[in-house]
Amino acid sequence: MTLGITEVKKGMVLKVEGDLYSVVKTEFVNPGKGSAFIRTKLKNLTKNSSIERTFKAAEKLESVELEKRNMTICYTEGNDIIFMDSNDFEQMPVSKEYVEDILPFLKEETPMEVTFYEGKPIGVIPPNFSILEVTYAEEGLKGDTSGTAQKRVTVETGGEINVPIFVKQGDVIKIDLRDLTYVERVSR
């Protein structure tokens, strides 16, 4: 769908020079002299980078519709994660690169939203939090409490994370997947 610059809004997906971009920020400028333009901040959906781009009033932009499907992780195979569609149970490989940094904190059957463009997966939106059991934790040292004392633990999926020294083996913890930080202990 073709759009004029005044129709571009935050959250839209545009095709610019063959790449897909999500509109992060827009600023419409109408100077007293000259023609209007729009200043945008765009996030590349396939390369995970951001650019700032200015479009002139006469330019036409191409808006694209993305398909979003609720899927769950089945297993990993090579460089792919095999996802299963929650509606029709179809299995589909998706590149690990979309969730590589948080993969050690994801259990099988974790629900996620997978984004498709023209039938091909182009992104994965993971949940914000993961609740996991601590399988290995060293004992915290008594008196080691200056500042925010932390130690490294291993969780049931094999991932390692820094936590406060009071967390021990067998505890269930909540991890924020957006920045891979400890949130809290969770009661069973």
UniProtKB/Swiss-Prot annotation:
Signal sequence, renumbered to the chain: none
Function: Involved in peptide bond synthesis. Stimulates efficient translation and peptide-bond synthesis on native or reconstituted 70S ribosomes in vitro. Probably functions indirectly by altering the affinity of the ribosome for aminoacyl-tRNA, thus increasing their reactivity as acceptors for peptidyl transferase.
Domain of life per record: Bacteria
Pfam families: EFP (PF01132), EFP_N (PF08207), Elong-fact-P_C (PF09285)
Gene name per UniProt: efp
A biological-process GO annotation: peptide biosynthetic process
Molecular function per GO: translation elongation factor activity
Protein name as catalogued: Elongation factor P
One Gene Ontology cellular component annotation held by this UniProt entry: cytoplasm
Provenance organism: Leptospira borgpetersenii serovar Hardjo-bovis (strain JB197)
SMART domains associated with the record: EFP (SM01185), Elong-fact-P_C (SM00841)
Matches recorded under SUPFAM superfamilies: Nucleic acid-binding proteins, Translation proteins SH3-like domain
Coiled-coil intervals, chain numbering: none
InterPro entries attached to this UniProt entry: Elong-fact-P_C, NA-bd_OB-fold, Rib_uL2_dom2, Transl_elong_fac_P/YeiP, Transl_elong_KOW-like, Transl_elong_P/YeiP_cen, Transl_elong_P/YeiP_CS, Transl_elongation_fac_P
Gene3D superfamilies from the UniProt entry: 2.30.30.30, Nucleic acid-binding proteins
Keywords recorded for this protein, A-Z: Cytoplasm, Elongation factor, Protein biosynthesis
Subcellular location: Cytoplasm
Pathway: Protein biosynthesis; polypeptide chain elongation
